[in-house]
Amino acid sequence: MEEFKRYLELDRSQQHDFVYPLIFQEYIYALAHDHGLNRSILLENIGYDNKSSLLIVKRLITHLITQMHQQNHFLFSANDSNQNPFFGHNTNLYSQMILEGFAVVVEIPFSLRLRFSLEGKEIVKSQNLRSIHSIFPFLEDKFSHLNYVLDILIPHSIHLEILVQTLRYWVKDASSLYLLRFFLHEYRNWNSLITPKKSSFSFSKRNQRLFLFLYNFHICEYESIFVFLRNQSSHLRSISSGTFLERRYFYGKIEHFLEVFTKDFQAVLWLFKDPFIHYVRYQGKSILASKGTSLLMNKWKYYLVNFWQCYFYMWSQPGRIHTNQLSKHSLDFLGYLSSVRLNPSMVRSQMLENSFLIGNTIKKFDTLVPIIPMIGSLSKAKFCNVLGHPISKPVWTDLSDSDILDQFGRIYRNLSHYHSGSSKKTSLYQIKYILRLSCARTLARKHKSTVRAFLKRLGSELLEEFFTGEEQVFSLTFPKASSTSRGLYRRRIWYLDIICINDLANHE
């Protein structure tokens, strides 16, 4: 327990108090209110070191404010004149301004912490880590060696005071915490800001920045403690904490087992002694994959539930965590169905005059596009019916022909780009067929003609021009490999420029 406390104190010792006087400066609220200005310049161009200076920050912000005035940016807007009975006269403007300024200020030390953590590491472009596709090469490399996965829905019903207390370890400024507590208690339904239901948004969308920051900070705090406990539990040693009471006897049995069979079963025992565990978080969910047994995964399942309830006071249930065997079940993950496929093969071995067959099974990470949810998304967007039959898009008939073609082509290229990591391209061909025929029917409806007559008059090549396939994009990106691009295209391709999921690709 003492080691656990020292770990937390060491991790939280990198606190930066120099930014908090900015809360009382007028220009920080002008900077926060200007949504067209890229705030990342605060961290990209300052040249921070471990002795960060308030003077440098103030000088940079003054420069940014000068740019804002030169570009005729206005601080106040007529849309901000709504009244709020809690604050009183014309307070929607002032409350939003204060909250936006507070969000900008409180993000600075944590963004600096991220920059310091990336320094010295062999990461050429850290922005590539933002890509959603950067997760899949990791899974492709690791999951083929694993057996079970926990599909976890992270609880988000966090008590407001727990958030303030968690942030208190990092922020020494008491006034900032009082201000944060004031806003959190005014908007008690802030949890709706992190749920996917758009109808539940009751606060200005501009203020999502602070609430999403608090939620992500809370999750990162939970993950840092969880990773520390996982690292501690992976070593064969006695731990006096009551949480690991059962594990202490478990380790004693393993040590005795090692003494007896250490010569014959070293490889097997090594895997049993220190099983591989990989953790990935995405969209309020996370997955915990391991090479261990189902019994071990069930222990992790109930340990996580108790960990959330006892340490963070978040109510959770075992039903929010599902245990799946990768070889038998697919994981619905970021628009893909991911699983580990077993490829059996037979090898004939010849020894002198005798020959015999040896069976061998190779595990392969498989990613597929779930076509039924995709058709459901296209049907909801009025591109086809529930059976997947293409229909026209009447609301687009007022557009010009080029705009209609551009709209359909852009949707297909985005979907094809995002799902380029699919192991099989059949689903993409079906999506292309639906969008092409829907586009043709929309154009025919606009010109009061039939699809056959319209295509006969203009030619089917008109649609092909705007539906540039991923295979053609690949050959343009890698011209030297044009001779083999067709074979390479059939493989999975992961891109490092995808930072959001297309609405049609997100089936959840």
Swiss-Prot record:
The keyword Chloroplast applies. GO terms for molecular function: RNA binding. It is found in: Plastid, Chloroplast. Pfam families: Intron_maturas2, MatK_N. Keywords: Chloroplast, mRNA processing, Plastid, RNA-binding, tRNA processing. This is Maturase K. GO terms for biological process: mRNA processing; RNA splicing; tRNA processing. Belongs to the intron maturase 2 family. MatK subfamily. GO terms for cellular component: chloroplast. InterPro entries: Domain_X, Maturase_MatK, Maturase_MatK_N. Usually encoded in the trnK tRNA gene intron. Probably assists in splicing its own and other chloroplast group II introns.
